[in-house]
Regions:
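Extended charged/polar low-complexity repeat regions
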Residues: 1-377
């Protein structure tokens, strides 16, 4: 089972050493180390060779990628548990990002350092909920002892020492990223930064409140529902007005308010969503499928016109019919999912060609004209 940062849990059959499996619905390959080279018929054979030899030969290492050009996500272990974690990312040119994890302490197992392919080292400053609570108490005490000091929102919040162990989003250990520091740059070995590249602050509930850049300027801000942990009700970018959101009892967005733009209202029915903007223009989206395979199959536009879309069993677009009833077909390669041809409403066809790395090499138009492209690798 491969768990990614998007919340997906993708199931694969157990792999033998050197074996590669492909998920058509998720467009993702999962591979297991154990061989020096893949057979030339394997689409990932060239990308396999950019990996370090020890990674290719180790049957204990698993790798994932969503493109024949990379990158590889290397899943290994600091010491052998029943699961593997991301340890290295290697791109199609062999350049790497290596992740270093804390071996002990309150943040054991969390990423605390990154080394890139140029030799630069970055430190990830982490904090626990207890540490943030202690810092908040000290800030609050300092504020109370100095009446002239301005009272911030954060100083008025009561930070609990722990967070609920389980949330509707999953387990939460309370560890958060506080700042990212550049600690070593081979090009400037004698220079030490005096400020982090980025800094983050959090609410008493562990939600991200603000993001600051290296100059100390706040570039993002977030507000949350006090009754529903993790539910964002507003956000803004530096120099821009705040966008706000309202929700129904099931946690679905019912309204988006944009002070300097259009506002939107959302109504939900069985397999449909009605979207109305502040100019009273109305669109309706009709959906089919469940979970990650849910797709919009029909769209009623504000002018009354209707477009329809058709998908294959993997959720990939295979045809669209416009408001005039003209149908365009999209034909895909069975294994890779790449677009091989487009059949226009009048029956004419545009064809697409690819190389062994699935990079687009040619487009042939209905009138016979052909464009081509070449790659240096």
């Amino acid at each position: 089972i491969l768990n990614d940062s998007g919340g997906r849990s993708i199931h694969f059959e157990p792999l033998f050493p050197g074996e590669i499996s492909y998920s058509r619905s998720e467009s993702l390959w999962l591979a297991r180390g154990g061989v020096a080279a893949q057979h030339s018929s394997q689409p990932l054979s060239a990308l396999w060779q950019v990996l370090p030899e020890d990674v290719r030969l180790s049957p204990h290492v698993y790798l994932a990628t969503n493109s024949l050009q990379g990158p590889w996500w290397i899943l290994s272990w600091p010491e052998p548990p029943a699961y593997r974690v991301l340890t290295v990312v290697v791109d199609g040119f062999g350049r790497s990002l290596t992740f270093h994890r804390a071996a002990e302490g309150d943040v054991a197992g969390a990423v605390t350092g990154v080394t890139d392919g140029a030799g630069r080292r970055f430190h990830m400053a982490l904090s626990t909920q207890a540490q943030r609570a202690e810092a908040s108490r000290k800030q609050r005490a300092s504020s109370l002892s100095s009446p002239a000091s301005p009272r911030s929102v954060s100083s008025s919040q009561v930070f609990p020492d722990t967070l609920p162990a389980g949330t509707e989003y999953g387990a939460d250990n309370g560890i958060r990223l506080e700042a990212v520091w550049l600690t070593h740059d081979p090009a400037y070995p004698d220079e030490q930064p005096t400020a982090p590249l980025a800094r983050y602050t959090y609410t008493a509930g562990g939600e991200l409140r603000a993001v600051y850049d290296r100059s100390g300027t706040q570039v993002r801000g977030f507000t949350y529902d006090a009754e529903h942990a993790g539910r964002m009700v507003a956000h803004h970018y530096a120099g821009r007005p705040e966008s706000r959101y309202r929700y129904d009892d099931t946690g679905r967005v019912t309204e988006q308010v944009n002070p300097e733009g259009l506002d939107y209202r959302f109504e939900y029915g069985e397999s449909r969503v009605i979207i109305t903007d502040s100019l009273n223009r109305r669109e309706v989206l009709y959906t089919e499928g469940e979970g990650g395979l849910k797709r919009v199959v029909k769209k009623e536009h504000a002018d009354g016109s209707i477009t329809r879309s058709e998908y294959d069993e993997a959720g990939r677009l295979k045809a669209q019919t416009d408001a005039a009833g003209r149908r365009t077909e999209y034909r895909l390669h069975m294994a890779s999912g790449k677009l091989t041809s487009v059949v226009l409403p009048d029956g004419r066809t545009v064809r697409y060609g690819y190389n062994n790395q699935l990079q687009l090499t040619s487009v042939t138009y209905p009138d016979g004209l052909r464009s081509s492209r070449k790659y240096d690798r």
